[in-house]
């Protein structure tokens, strides 16, 4: 019954990349620009949030448009893993209890894109077509 959706797998891969990129960028804009405002964030600077904001903004934007997708996804996955262990793991054993479920999910979604690539709606795919 659901096999007919297999034909849309490449496009849905692009949709997943775009939505993930938008959400990741929003974390960066919250930390760097203060928009959208998030409670509990320290002011930007030499804090972990101050350093992670620009990374989320840059990596998220590149991931969103699908430029250098695999290396960007590799870096973002590693960044998410480090963030999980530095910020959340010490607060409890389970992600649902330590508030780390979102960053853990980002880590594995990015890791998936290292293997899967960006999908057809990406700058990478457009550059591949031109070559």
Placement of each model-derived feature along the sequence:
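Conserved catalytic-core motifs of eukaryotic protein kinase domains, centered on the activation segment
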Residues: 36
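Perimembrane loop-to-helix junctions flanking transmembrane segments
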Residues: 39-50
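Extended, low-polarity transmembrane helix blocks
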Residues: 1-33, 48-58, 65-131
């Amino acid at each position: 019954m659901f096999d007919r959706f297999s034909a849309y797998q490449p496009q849905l891969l692009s949709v997943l990349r775009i939505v993930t990129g938008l959400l990741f960028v929003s974390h960066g804009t919250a930390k760097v620009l203060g928009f959208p405002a998030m409670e509990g964030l320290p002011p930007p600077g030499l804090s972990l949030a101050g350093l992670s904001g620009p990374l989320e903004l840059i990596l998220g934007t590149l991931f969103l448009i699908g430029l250098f997708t695999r290396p960007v996804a590799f870096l973002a996955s590693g960044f998410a893993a480090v963030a999980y262990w530095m910020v959340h793991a010490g607060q409890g054993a389970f992600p649902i209890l330590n508030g780390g479920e979102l960053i853990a999910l980002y880590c594995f979604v990015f890791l998936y894109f290292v293997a899967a690539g960006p999908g057809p709606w990406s700058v990478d795919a457009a550059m591949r077509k031109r070559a």
